[in-house]
Regions:
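Residues that form generic nucleotide/phosphate-binding pockets
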Residues: 85, 205-208, 224, 228
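Pre-Walker A adenine-sensing motif
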Residues: 216-230
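Accessory nucleic-acid engagement/destabilization modules that flank
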Residues: 2-11, 15-205
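Dynamic helix-loop-helix/coil hinge segments at AAA+ ATPase domain boundaries and subdomain interfaces
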Residues: 13-15, 207-216
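Walker A/P-loop
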Residues: 229-237
């Protein structure tokens, strides 16, 4: 078990502290009802946990300590290194690994994984008991998952097309939510606010209107929308 509190994620935060901050943002979104699907939430928590593990390599730590720039000759982007710490036996590994791998766009990630294996192994050598090999077969699966699904490829197997499409759509959600949580944690801002303020403000506004015009009230459409605040509504004029 790696003690992430020993490694810096940035000047003022350890990897453990930042990861906990990101996880807390995910929990906030879930608790406030912005994440409805339990499955998406569980995958997001895993992605939040692992997304910055790659920063514990010695070159990154040296760069943070010495405040130097990224060295393309001796470093690999941390998002690439991070996925080697994810156990491929966990549920929904491919979606979680893909979300972590592409949560930054610092390089051609798949090319790096295929063509810079020696440097990757060197940077992860100190953590040999905590990492998992990723072969070309898995790299190919990740490449297929991140790209748009070609329906023509599955015209003889619509069920497989349905499965692949669902998996890709779940990846889009998890990756997007990971971005939100990571950016919010890095900026040290609230990720979202409770959606409980608008009704009171509208009621107060109506009371002010009724002081001048006692018969004022909401029209039929407005009443409908107020009664369906938890639903997705499309209104056409």
């Amino acid at each position: 078990m790696i003690d992430l509190s020993r490694y810096k994620a940035k000047d003022n935060k350890t990897v453990r502290e930042h990861s906990d901050d990101v996880i807390q943002r995910a929990m906030t979104l879930y608790d406030r009802g912005y994440i409805k699907e339990e499955r998406i939430y569980k995958m997001l928590l895993k992605a939040c946990e692992y997304h910055d593990y790659g920063k514990i390599n010695r070159e990154f730590q040296h760069r943070i300590e010495c405040k130097t720039k990224f060295d393309v000759e001796h470093e690999i982007s941390h998002n690439v290194l991070s996925i080697y710490f994810i156990d491929p036996r966990i549920d929904d590994y491919e979606i979680i690994a893909c979300s972590v791998l592409f949560h930054h766009n610092y390089c051609e990630e798949l090319d790096v994984m295929q063509n810079q294996k020696e440097l990757i192994n060197e940077l992860l050598h100190d953590f040999s008991e905590d990492i998992y090999p990723i072969g070309n077969r898995m790299i190919k699966k990740i490449e297929e998952l991140i790209n748009e699904i070609d329906e023509n490829k599955y015209n003889k197997n619509p069920k497989l097309f349905e499965i692949k499409t669902k998996q890709h759509n779940e990846l889009v959600k998890v990756k997007g939510l990971l971005h939100r949580c990571d950016y919010s944690a890095s900026a040290e801002t609230d990720i979202e606010y409770p959606a409980d303020y608008l009704t009171d403000k509208l009621d107060n506004m109506m009371k002010e209107w009724q002081k001048e015009k006692p018969e004022a009230g909401w029209n039929e459409l407005q009443e409908f929308c107020r009664k369906h605040t938890d639903d997705n509504i499309i209104v056409t004029a």
